Amino acid sequence: MGNTKSAEKKGIGALNWTLLLVIGFSAQIAWVIENNWFANFLYSDFGAQLGVVTAMTICSATATTFSALFFGTLSDRIGSRKKLITWGSILWGIFTIAFGLTHYLRDSIYNDVMLVGVTIVAADTIMSFFGSMANDAGYNAWYADMMDDSNSGQIGAVAATLPVIGTLVGTLVGGMFVNGLATEANPQAGYIIFFSVAGGVTILVGIASFFLLKDAPTLKPVKDGGFWHQFG
């Protein structure tokens, strides 16, 4: 009986395939920026700040893990992945742009190394928090909801290739921005523009998701006691 249903199962549709690719690809570009380019930007703009980089790594990993668990639980309880993808992507994009704008802290609080470090770590941590909300808790669960025996191989294969493609494209395109748009007056201009463009695209993806993306029809709210009981 299960095989008959699987054989009769229709595909996920052109729109969902498009969203799967576009949302997933834009998310991987944003992660490449956070994982690869933020530290380079920090070194270029403020010099070798190993303590700040270490703090960024620890706080980002903590925020990502907590966000995935928190919003994953919330998503199950409200029965919606769309809201997480939409609002998470918009906020993710905003804080990706904001990280580049920390460059202008040099003129205002440059001598206060502690304040600069805290601001940079906070911007990166918040960006990672909303990135995990949109991608880990929202997007990953959204496409998992559409998977069954008839399409799990296709969807899984596409999702698995996106990090590889995103890393390659993000590294190459990022290098073009960073090296090609730097000026003598502002050597960090390429970083700022790259972060702004990528953040803007992520915001647009969130807006598009609001209008185009739909949760799986089988998705229903699941509540098991209180929120923190279900969270644990």
Role assignments for model-derived ranges:
Residues 1-14, 216-232:
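Juxtamembrane intracellular "pre-TM" segments in multi-pass secondary transporters
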Residues 2-64:
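Helix-loop boundary and gating motifs at the non-cytosolic
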Residues 53-75, 93-95:
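Central cavity-lining transmembrane alpha-helices of secondary-active solute carriers
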Residues 60-65, 153-179:
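Glycine-rich segments within core transmembrane alpha-helices of 12-TM secondary carriers
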Residues 81-82, 111-113, 176-200:
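A membrane-interface helix-boundary motif in multi-pass transporters
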Residues 87-114:
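C-terminal ends and interior cores of transmembrane alpha-helices
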Residues 124-161:
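Cytoplasmic helix-loop-helix junction between adjacent transmembrane helices
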Residues 199-219:
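C-terminal membrane-cytosol helix-exit motif in multi-pass small-molecule transporters
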